[in-house]
Amino acid sequence: MFQYKHTANNQYQTGIFLAILSCIVFGARGDLISTEILATRNVINTQTYIEEELAQIVTDMFAIDPAQYGYWLYKITYETIDIHGNIHIATGTVSYPRVDWPDVPDQAFPILSYQHGTVVEKSDVTSVIGEWILPAILTGAGYVYVEPDYLGLGDSEGMHPYQLKEPYGTAVVDMLRAVRYYAAFENEQFVVNDQLFLAGYSEGGYATMATHQIIERDYSDEFDITVSFPMAGAYSLSGIMTDVMLEQQPYGQPFYFPYILFAYLNFYPSIGTVEQYLLPEYVFLADWFDGYHSSGEIN
């Protein structure tokens, strides 16, 4: 279990030790490359922003507790591994509670990692778009909000490995490592405790379930999951999802099928080629999943 606490005397020595340990045990996985501030708000502006955003999407019957904190929203660039186990650059965002009043004792906040839903374009992620309501609400409630872009999205090169368990788990775990390192050794205002919450919706529901399993399988000595709530994910890929994809009925978002197909062909080359699965007039679709075409265009 990681317990992070800043002290003037041991911060440098501990940082050197952790860097050496990281090279020995983890390679470069989880190494923090850079941070970039995207936005910051005090608690009053955070509450105003939340109210304005909620007013556009829900009725006045919907209510949440007032924000207790403002926030700093950062883009994080870090090292993870790609689908072949090679070192790979990935990005994501972290939003940390902002405390503006003086004489407040050190507060250590829990981490909540949110795995986002299905996107096709590399730019359709928080590290590119910037502020949105969910990190404002959750950081305002006192969570360190973490949102990985995943492999193949944001600044990450290559195709996104859609609906593949292992790449989700490694991308999330390594971003959590980078966030913990940043809080421990590069920003004395940021202190995290050992609580870890996992959440996700749609693709993020599957990514959350995958990450939960991988943490329990491989990283239980490093992370202790407090609560996990995957939502609306495609968990039964070989069962229900296969039936849905192969039924002879129109599907409202047909890009899902080639998205999964091309990701699996990329990850499991032994299962065949695009030409073996698609009619000749649809083979060109493989080039459209480059991160620069929208789901609407592909549909």
Regions found by a protein language model. Give the residues of each.
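A conserved short beta-strand
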Residues: D221-A232
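Alpha/beta-hydrolase active-site loop
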Residues: Q163-F185
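Gly/Ser-rich "nucleophile elbow"/oxyanion-hole loop immediately N-terminal to the catalytic nucleophile
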Residues: R98-A108, A178-A199, S220-F223
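Gly/Ala-rich beta-loop-alpha elbow adjacent to hydrolase catalytic centers
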Residues: G200-G204, T208
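Conserved alpha/beta-hydrolase
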Residues: P135-D155
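Short, surface-exposed "cap/lid" segments of acyl-processing enzymes
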Residues: H84, I89, R98-I137
